[in-house]
UniProtKB/Swiss-Prot annotation:
This is Serine protease SplC. Keywords: Hydrolase, Protease, Secreted, Serine protease, Signal. The gene is splC. The keyword Hydrolase applies. GO terms for molecular function: serine-type endopeptidase activity. Its main location: secreted. It comes from the Bacteria. It is found in: Secreted. It comes from Staphylococcus aureus (strain bovine RF122 / ET3-1). Residues 1-36 form the signal peptide. The active site is at residues 75, 113, 193.
Length: 239
């Protein structure tokens, strides 16, 4: 082959590689800017609290509340049965906190979209701290209450398949509270169903059930943990 042709081909390849790298960097930077505008950050280490209190379903989120007990939504639990599995705080790594079988599902009898699951204590696949659920997953405590304008955060797995089960945190404020419903403006997407809504002390004030995926929306909703909701949860915590 002509030496000049080889040199030109190598130069063209170098330029293409360089441009591709630049494009990838631009896409990544654009995504980071978009997330910053939404007050969303990717969690780097899910083995520390509060991130290790969150669990993943195939297309939704849940979180631990005391021994072997998980909270999520009824519209999530309806797709699961006893013996199905959940994964503890993955972050692109399905075995990060262990994989556990569900052994009981209790849906709230009212209209509120909340469900309590109990899982087997011993993992099907071990986590970073062994096979025990309670050693790999740190449970949240209930907040005493919440009020309008409180700062909150939502932790979960938005678009889990697309984001390869990476965990994200979004921040915002409480916009309204009425009965068992809490509205907030932290950004959420499909997959955030079942995410904990936490105050600045990382105490849980509610569980996300839905939203409209719009920046600044005040219509993202959570089941607010009123005394009657807390009582239901307490009755279904494994003793």
């Amino acid at each position: 082959m002509n030496k000049n042709i080889v040199i030109k081909s190598m130069a063209a390849l170098a330029i293409l590689t360089s441009v591709t790298g630049i494009n990838a960097a631009v896409v990544d930077e654009t995504q980071q800017i978009a997330n910053a505008e939404k007050n969303v950050t990717q969690v780097k280490d899910t083995n520390v609290f509060p991130y290790n209190g969150v669990v993943s379903f195939k297309d939704a989120t849940g979180f631990a509340i005391e021994k072997n007990t998980i909270i999520t939504n009824k519209h999530v639990s309806k797709d699961y049965k006893v013996g199905d599995r959940i994964t503890a705080h993955p972050n692109g790594d399905k075995g990060n906190g262990g994989i556990y079988k569900i052994k009981n599902i209790s849906d709230y009898p009212g209209n509120e979209d909340i469900s309590v699951m109990n899982v087997e204590e011993n993992a099907v696949e071990r986590g970073a701290n062994g096979y025990n659920f309670n050693e790999n997953v740190q449970a949240f405590n209930f907040a005493k209450d919440a009020k309008v304008d409180d700062k909150i955060k939502v932790i979960g797995y938005p678009l889990p398949a697309q984001n390869t089960f990476k965990q994200f945190e979004s921040t915002g404020t409480v916009k309204s509270i009425k009965d068992n419903n809490l509205n907030f403006d932290a950004y959420i997407e499909p997959g955030n169903s079942g995410s904990p809504v936490l105050n600045l002390n990382n105490e849980v004030v509610g569980v996300v059930y839905g939203g409209i995926g719009k920046i600044g929306s005040e219509y993202n909703g959570a089941v607010y943990f009123t005394p009657q909701i807390k009582e239901f949860i307490q009755k279904h915590i494994e003793q």
